[in-house]
A protein has these predicted regions:
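Charge-biased low-complexity segments
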Residues: 1-97
């Protein structure tokens, strides 16, 4: 997972990107997706996920993943110089590999 430059990175419930990846995969169960998908999103100051972009799968699959990520449980927001800030995140998930 790559982030904008911040001192404290946002974290998914459970604290790891592995938990986030597993959560997305669980939500996609039965979708028969394979390949790599790039997911970009912003974690806002309240821990909500906004501005989701998904690339790498077909439109229908991208839209489904986008909705799953958009409605993910709140994250712990990122911080910079002691202030809670919006942070742009990017990760690649591998399905069926």
């Amino acid at each position: 997972m790559s982030y904008e430059s911040v001192q404290v990175k946002p974290t998914f419930k459970g604290g790891t990107i592995t938990k986030f990846a597993q959560w997305v995969e669980d939500m996609m169960e039965g979708s028969n997706v394979s390949g790599n998908v790039i997911i970009e999103f912003t974690v806002n100051v309240y821990g909500g996920v906004r501005n989701v972009v998904v690339k790498g799968a077909g439109k229908k699959t991208n839209d489904k993943i986008m909705n799953i990520v958009r409605f993910s449980p709140n994250w712990a927001p990122g911080k910079n110089r002691g202030k809670v800030v919006h942070v742009r995140c990017r990760t690649t998930l591998s399905f069926g590999n």
